């Protein structure tokens, strides 16, 4: 643009040169008359000046004197540069808003890929509430919410997938499902596998939005994923992150009797997100949100493992023999827990200052269900169970064994930060 303006300036000056030449020749006779009336000395001086001007004119290919060019430059250059600057500013003011708007709109469409994923699959995510039928709200008279979680629709006729720990092990309760459009339905539990921590629910409604199931075997570390659910009863909540590992063995997490390689992600999976989908950028579920250890470390059950569970559940339904599988229902305490393996302990110690360096084993209390025996006994999320009835607790299986002992009360030693405490819990019979 600047070169184009300079070329225009050059053409402008050349066109004005003719006018300058004409003005100079028009003024020449008067100059000669003046010289003829002067003294001889003046005549000689004028003749010398005329000879000098003629020499200058011969040296200048355009036929202008040095004085004439200097006059032209002295007049036209400031004027033309001002015009050039005005033209450039005007063109810039005209073009800049258009370029900025086009660029920003393009960025919004190009980089808001998370919003596109959510728009395509959020309608299939549901909120699950577990209502305690023995306790009622003082004002509404309705059963209070004992716990909550998430799930997602996998069949149009009302089949919903979630975690087993969301819907079982709480006696005297009922399950309620709220859809993304606000409609609420009672639900029945169809299949439960506590070994894999998976369950299916059924609500009596048709033509629901269905979540597409992808392939977790094709995932790579570093891929973007989106976790959907209802943390803390906040429906339709979205968090995003990347896959940190595609092969986190259950043994590394201290989960015995589970032959699962979990998906590890830094997408936030908090209370209430359990059972919700972990989806890829194609809007396909590639995992089921399961648990969180600490900020930036969460785990999901791979969808390929989930498909095996769903195939077996479908076969049982066809035979009319759908039933609960896995561990038998034990006495109820009301917690979700995670074994503290050496790797998890290292991560926790590096992220917090409130953990003793001497701690080498235990079970982390990840979630406490409100109104449960654990809640009534004083357990809190973040507590670390180290002993039950004077026996060391090294993994979650030791806690299940303590529940199966049949003792009426459990004397539990916990670490809350750096402080050691004791709590007493009376589990409920199934």
UniProtKB/Swiss-Prot annotation:
SUPFAM superfamilies per record: PDZ domain-like (SSF50156), Trypsin-like serine proteases (SSF50494)
One term of GO molecular function: serine-type endopeptidase activity
Alphabetical keyword list: Apoptosis, Hydrolase, Membrane, Mitochondrion, Protease, Serine protease, Transit peptide, Transmembrane, Transmembrane helix, Zymogen
EC number in record: 3.4.21.108
Organism in which the protein naturally occurs: Drosophila mojavensis
Entry similarity comment: Belongs to the peptidase S1C family.
Residues annotated as catalytic: 165 (charge relay system), 197 (charge relay system), 274 (charge relay system)
Protein name, UniProt field: Serine protease HTRA2, mitochondrial
Protein origin, superkingdom: Eukaryota
Gene designation: HtrA2
One Pfam family it belongs to: PDZ_6
Reactions catalysed, as given in the entry: Cleavage of non-polar aliphatic amino-acids at the P1 position, with a preference for Val, Ile and Met. At the P2 and P3 positions, Arg is selected most strongly with a secondary preference for other hydrophilic residues
Compositionally biased residues, Low complexity: 30-51
PANTHER family recorded: SERINE PROTEASE FAMILY S1C HTRA-RELATED, SERINE PROTEASE HTRA2, MITOCHONDRIAL
Entry GO CC: cytosol; mitochondrial intermembrane space; mitochondrial membrane; Nebenkern
Record's subcellular location: Mitochondrion intermembrane space; Mitochondrion membrane
């Amino acid at each position: 643009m600047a070169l184009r303006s300079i070329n225009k300036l050059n053409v402008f000056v050349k066109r004005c040169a003719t006018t300058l030449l004409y003005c100079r020749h028009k003024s020449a006779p008067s100059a000669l008359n003046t010289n003829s009336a002067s003294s001889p000395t003046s005549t000689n001086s004028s003749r010398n000046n005329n000879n000098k001007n003629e020499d200058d004119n011969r040296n200048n290919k355009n036929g202008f004197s040095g004085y004439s060019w200097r006059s032209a430059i002295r007049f036209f250059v400031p004027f033309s540069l001002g015009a050039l600057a005005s033209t450039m500013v005007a063109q810039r003011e005209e073009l800049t808003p258009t370029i900025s708007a086009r660029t920003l709109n393009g960025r919004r469409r190009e980089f808001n890929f998370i919003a596109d994923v959510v728009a395509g699959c959020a309608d299939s995510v549901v909120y699950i509430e577990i209502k305690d039928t023995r306790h009622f709200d003082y004002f509404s008279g309705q059963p209070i919410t004992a716990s909550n979680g998430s799930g997602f629709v996998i069949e149009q006729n009302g089949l919903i997938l979630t975690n087993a720990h969301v819907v079982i092990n709480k006696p005297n309760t009922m399950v309620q499902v709220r859809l993304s459009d606000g409609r609420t339905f009672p639900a029945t539990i169809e299949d439960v596998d506590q070994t894999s921590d998976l369950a299916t629910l059924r609500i009596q409604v048709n033509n629901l939005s269905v979540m597409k199931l992808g392939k977790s075997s094709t995932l790579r570390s570093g891929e973007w994923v989106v976790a959907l659910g209802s943390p803390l009863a906040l429906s339709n909540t979205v968090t995003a992150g990347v896959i940190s590992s595609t092969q986190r063995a259950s043994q590394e997490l201290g989960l015995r009797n589970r032959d699962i390689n979990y998906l590890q992600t830094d997408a936030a999976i908090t209370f209430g997100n359990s059972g919700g989908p972990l989806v890829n950028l194609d809007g396909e579920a590639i995992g089921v949100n399961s648990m969180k250890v600490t900020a930036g470390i969460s785990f999901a059950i791979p969808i390929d493992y989930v498909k095996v569970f769903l195939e077996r559940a479908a076969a049982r339904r066809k035979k009319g023999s759908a039933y609960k599988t896995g561990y038998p229902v034990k006495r109820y305490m009301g917690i979700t827990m995670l074994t503290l393996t050496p790797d998890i302990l290292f991560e926790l110690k590096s992220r917090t200052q409130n953990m003793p360096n001497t701690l080498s084993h235990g079970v982390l209390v990840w979630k406490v269900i409100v109104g449960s025996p654990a809640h009534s006994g004083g357990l809190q999320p973040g507590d670390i169970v180290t002993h039950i009835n004077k026996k060391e607790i090294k993994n979650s299986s030791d806690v299940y064994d303590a529940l199966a002992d049949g003792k009426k009360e459990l004397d539990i030693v916990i670490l809350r930060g750096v402080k050691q405490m004791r709590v007493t819990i009376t589990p409920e019979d199934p």
